[in-house]
Amino acid sequence: VKFDIKNQCGYTVWAAGLPGGGKEFDQGQTWTVNLAAGTASARFWGRTGCTFDASGKGSCRSGDCGGQLSCTVSGAVPATLAEYTQSDQDYYDVSLVDGFNIPLAINPTNTKCTAPACKADINAVCPSELKVDGGCNSACNVLQTDQYCCRNAYVNNCPATNYSKIFKNQCPQAYSYAKDDTATFACASGTDYSIVFCP
């Protein structure tokens, strides 16, 4: 499976992928990641405001992955995620479960499949208690309650909250909290994808 990751933002994005690593790329550039056969899942996200030295060590304002240019661990929250899982078919989503940093879209090459996007700038409407430098955090990450994190008593019955509704209203096709199962999409196995920052 091939992922073409494209930067349409008016600024540099340091893309990250598990698997895949990471890459600095400017507006208009593309980074291609080929997943090995049998790869069960992958996630991609964009990092902003990064500085790295010649050895690839440094830090990012949002989405930082342990201070490495080439990521081997998940990114720091908040970060808009493109998630992919392979089983009987492909399942994919744009996730705001870990918050939002930059707009993102997933475009399958199979045009019969849905192309979910989060094009809004959620940072512009982020409640002050969720606002952080470079992004808008999720209520679960900040408040850590079972209700916001869909844990314990809420594991099987976890309705949307006022916070997750802010994300959902801005980006109806994105996964807005842990139990927002309306926002996972399926496509035939063998499909390739492009992931676009600032679609």
Swiss-Prot record:
Pfam families xref list: Thaumatin (PF00314)
Statement: the UniProt record of this protein carries the keyword Cytoplasm: yes
Nucleotide-binding as UniProt keyword: no
Expression sites by tissue: Expressed in pollen.
Keywords: Allergen, Cytoplasm, Disulfide bond, Endoplasmic reticulum, Extracellular matrix, Golgi apparatus, Mitochondrion, Nucleus, Secreted, Stress response, Vacuole
InterPro entries: Osmotin/thaumatin-like_sf, Thaumatin
GO biological processes: pollen germination; pollen hydration
GO CC aspect terms: endoplasmic reticulum; exine; extracellular space; Golgi cisterna; Golgi stack; intine; mitochondrion; nucleus
Subcellular location: Secreted; Secreted, Extracellular space, Extracellular matrix, Pollen coat; Cytoplasm; Nucleus
Inducing factors: By air pollution.
Source organism superkingdom: Eukaryota
S-S pairs: 9-198, 50-60, 65-71, 113-187, 118-171, 126-136, 140-149, 150-158
Family note: Belongs to the thaumatin family.
Name of protein: Pathogenesis-related 5 protein Cup a 3
Species annotation: Hesperocyparis arizonica
